[in-house]
Amino acid sequence: MANSPVMNVEVLRYNPEIDQEPHLSTYQVPYDNQTSLLDALGYIKDKLEPSLSYRWSCRMAICGSCGMMVNNKPKLACKTFLRDYSGHMRIEPLANFPIERDLVVDLSHFIESLEAIKPYIIGNEAPALDGKPHPSKELQVSRTKQTPAQLEKYRQFSMCINCGLCYAACPQFGLNPEFLGPAAITMAHRYNLDNRDHGKAKRMSLLNGKNGVWSCTFVGYCSEVCPKHVDPASAINQGKVESAKDYVISMLKPKG
């Protein structure tokens, strides 16, 4: 890139094997109108600092791997372009997560929260028909049939790519690392809205808990930073409505 403009890219570095604490290093990266932050990190790794660690995969904002803080805002590196910044960028790992190395964070709690809410369709147990262990083809079709209107109820919430940007944006997750978090609650709500699913009661026990929907104070920044416009804040608020219904029903129809 002869005669190209140069961006000063300040990157947080941390190797737990040799560093007592994270520190910042600055690299000069030539760029053009099409250079993404992910391209810039690749340039740094290939030509300036081979030990730089960061996550990436698809380059198309589909995999959700390259989330990081750009000038204190959660962004995907592949969707962030150097042309939109004037001379300086500060790149740090996603906020609210433990740092493993450089820009790589430990997503264990995030993954565990997603697993806990059972992010898959839970169907009814299939009864035996005519002595056969599996339901008929007609019954199978009836259990999986879905109209466009039924799909539209949850379609927006199904677009999540598990990038973790909403967790980095969430002040409540920063204060309470046990909070299920925006993405997990959104995913739970997505399946609760699916007419083919019968696992709502199992998920609501988590959403109704102390680390569920009521931990959210509705700042709304999670929806602002979402690269797929999933609107997790809306999903959480809808989850609060369902939780309130559960509470009222439990008061009117106590168990026992």
From Swiss-Prot:
- EC number per UniProt: 1.3.5.1
The entry marks the following residues as binding [3Fe-4S] cluster, namely 170, 216, 222
Annotated membrane topology: Peripheral membrane protein
Q: Which Gene3D superfamilies match?
A: 3.10.20.30, Alpha-helical ferredoxin
**Organism lineage string:** Bacteria, Pseudomonadati, Pseudomonadota, Gammaproteobacteria, Pasteurellales
Would you identify the family this protein belongs to, as annotated? Belongs to the succinate dehydrogenase/fumarate reductase iron-sulfur protein family.
Q: Which cofactor does it need?
A: [2Fe-2S] cluster; [3Fe-4S] cluster; [4Fe-4S] cluster
Q: Which UniProt keywords apply?
A: 2Fe-2S, 3Fe-4S, 4Fe-4S, Cell inner membrane, Cell membrane, Electron transport, Iron, Iron-sulfur, Membrane, Metal-binding, Oxidoreductase, Transport, Tricarboxylic acid cycle
What NCBIfam families does the entry give? dhsB, PRK05950.1, PRK12385.1
Give the organism the record lists.
Haemophilus influenzae (strain ATCC 51907 / DSM 11121 / KW20 / Rd)
Kindly list the positions annotated as binding a menaquinone.
14, 237-240
Domain called 4Fe-4S ferredoxin-type: residue spans: 151-180
**Gene Ontology biological process terms from the UniProt entry:** anaerobic respiration; tricarboxylic acid cycle
The record's comment on cofactor binding reads: Binds 1 [2Fe-2S] cluster. Binds 1 [3Fe-4S] cluster.
What region holds the 2Fe-2S ferredoxin-type domain? 7-97
Q: Which GO terms describe its molecular function?
A: 2 iron, 2 sulfur cluster binding; 3 iron, 4 sulfur cluster binding; 4 iron, 4 sulfur cluster binding; electron transfer activity; metal ion binding; succinate dehydrogenase (quinone) activity
**Cited InterPro entries:** 2Fe-2S_ferredoxin-like_sf, 2Fe-2S_ferredoxin-type, 2Fe2S_fd_BS, 4Fe4S_Fe-S-bd, 4Fe4S_Fe_S_CS, Beta-grasp_dom_sf, Helical_ferredxn, Succ_DH/fum_Rdtase_Fe-S
Q: What name appears for this protein in its UniProt entry?
A: Fumarate reductase iron-sulfur subunit
A Pfam family (short name) is Fer4_10
Binding, [2Fe-2S] cluster? 58, 63, 66, 78
